[in-house]
């Protein structure tokens, strides 16, 4: 089912820290793949990250000055590339992602892509993206007063039904 010559749809899972964004994505992925879709994810980390391990050969390549290092095995490929700016989702999609039907992102709060906000009433007073025209749904423990579909965080089938209807057909 992988998208070939059309733009791959992107859905951003957004919300404040500790609301369950990663947990929701972990539940959505197997439901989508179980329905036959291929899924890519992009996680934004404002704090930076280290994918490599000190002392490993690829780490030593980077430490020696390589601007790009590719780790390749029979089962996976990883690219570690120095960048001078934060990349937009479209740039990452166009450069690194192919042969998938949908991209789920986490942490790209400023993106112009459709958003599903994860909400916890005990952590937040208000929905962050209430007035964002790209807000597609809210997932949480207590339905807020918004003009988009609201789902309980355990209603993975309902959430994926919405994603499938809006972005995959």
Locations of the language-model features?
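Phosphate/Mg2+-binding loops and adjacent switch elements
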Residues: 102-169
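N-terminal phosphate/diphosphate-binding loop that engages ATP/GTP or pyrophosphate donors
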Residues: 27-84
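Conserved lysine of the Walker
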Residues: 21
